Amino acid sequence: MDQRGRQKQLACLAALLLASACGDGNAADERGIGAQCTGNDQCNVDLQQVCLPFKGGYCGEMGCTKDADCVPDSACIRHTDGVNYCFRTCADKAECNANRDPANEANCSSSVDFVEGAMGRKACVPPS
């Protein structure tokens, strides 16, 4: 293969790698809601996210009183521990675990207490 052919091949490979890196993420992915963490510095502190005390950690916010307190693609959930958290919303389990390892998978569940009502939604619930 001549040099020009190699350049074309490398250009195609670079384009393919860039396209695969873009993903199908939503606002919650971009903001890190639901991501696994071990400390607050791994969460989006500009958006007041903290590493919540769940198994594997969970980047989110606590103390919300309504969905508007949470970033887009997340909702205010009254957890069984009595605290309100902003958890990412989901359609299926895969959406919950893009940024979590298999040992700390979250579940996409409709069996949570949405502060403003479920309205057919589900949320990514981290393991306890």
For the regions a language model picked out, list residue spans one by one.
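Secreted, cysteine-rich disulfide-bonded mini-domains of extracellular proteins
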Residues: 22-128
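Sec-dependent bacterial lipoprotein signal peptides
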Residues: 1-20
